[in-house]
């Protein structure tokens, strides 16, 4: 049975794991790393790069290198803040109002949804996992922030489908971390999972023990993460440079990309050192010449710059503990998740809020993927006696008279869940009702996130308040909502599976899947072309070396013929003309037998006449060490296959 891939699709980095021998195992990517940057780039030649390859060229190609796209997934353009738009690439409004990304692909402007960008990262993880395991991967469990709304969950599921994965389950990141932490725990524990990643913050309180994982409450902030710490450092660097030089770098994408990389390095370094020297030579220039940035950022200064960000984790944690029905003193373990939790100030804040020293036994970068793999094992039947009881993070409501949001399912309700309520008409002889659904905690409908709407018509004429309309909300195990409305008088029913107002339609998902499949073929073809070029290059090198070694021992006409063929093949290689390379390689290989025969004949002739020039003389017998004759030089071994 093929394995289910557990994927932590992160804002900054992604990680994948599978169950092997009853244990979760993190899989390395094709570069040998255990995490993959969630970055996609498009080059001038139209090539698509994903992961480390995309990250490496970001400084030279900032406008076409997309990072942190998870912060856009399932969101409307109108919901974005100015801070969200402070990226070198272009964010545009799609016809349906979603936030999309516009880049230059081989000289042509193309627009992608965040789901499509995410699918490119997922497709790389899938391909790397298949290569590592030697089997086809078709199914996955993908994690999302606990505080993701319905639209964001649907968008993540769509990204998996585009990548060619059947998404067996969408699981909350803190819940996945708790699974990995507590799989072998027998005694009951109350644990708090404090998850601060690249783009989102989650806090969950769970009761675990003897295979039961019950989420008591979840809270968080989907717009708070490591990117915000980076931005605080970036803004400080830009401000300091402006004070010194009078120049504003905020509208120079190339400079911003370099500053972003340096800001990220500074943030990481300051988790283990007290100060970091920021050095960015030739960052820009004016009439007086080139300008450089040379600054020192201390840990206390970083903590001062980001104090307000860290403080934003306080309320969700306290609210979550209160909603769980526990007190701070009832928390037995504090599990830290996400790269940002390596920062001493973050650890101290988590410790203060939860009243516990952080648990040190989990890797914050890998624990979520391991939990996703365990959930995959549960779904496949490889992991037994595990019961996972998660909750819906936000209240789900319908609009009633006066624009009120009337709750159908309260936040922190255990899922899956199904709830029904009976409503009526607001006017006499009303022939239809509009069912509008939202997600959020505000009292007025318009202040919450609109998820979708549909119409139930054909209601029999009757005075206001007489018709009975039963509305049912059904949340599945993925946390995705299905809504139905039924006229109890006529039996007429209307249903909607909320795709989220920021989701892709089925047709759009299918189109994106076809594009992804075509790109997979394209990638395969490109890899084959590169292999052909490398083989030809290696062949030229090998033949040239043999010609040189043989010297004048070869017939002149054969030597000239082969030299001509090598020259033609090298020209084709330099032009990357694959058709010409294949023909030239075939042509050259057809004459190699003649070359080998001539070489053999020359060697036999040389053997009869004594050693060939450059050949080692036969060793004389000796009873002990001899003094070396001539010069002794360092030897180099050349591997013809490389």
UniProtKB/Swiss-Prot annotation:
Induction: By stress conditions e.g. heat shock. It comes from Akkermansia muciniphila (strain ATCC BAA-835 / DSM 22959 / JCM 33894 / BCRC 81048 / CCUG 64013 / CIP 107961 / Muc). PROSITE patterns: HSP70_1, HSP70_2, HSP70_3. InterPro entries: ATPase_NBD, Chaperone_DnaK, Heat_shock_70_CS, HSP70_C_sf, HSP70_peptide-bd_sf, Hsp_70_fam. Keywords: ATP-binding, Chaperone, Nucleotide-binding, Phosphoprotein, Stress response. Residues 600-616 have a biased composition (Low complexity). This is Chaperone protein DnaK. Belongs to the heat shock protein 70 family. GO terms for molecular function: ATP binding; ATP-dependent protein folding chaperone; unfolded protein binding. Residues 623-634 have a biased composition (Basic and acidic residues). The modification Phosphothreonine is found at residue 200. Acts as a chaperone. Residues 600-642 are annotated as: Disordered. Transmembrane segments: none annotated. Pfam families: HSP70. CDD domains: ASKHA_NBD_HSP70_DnaK-like (cd10234). The keyword Flavoprotein does not apply.
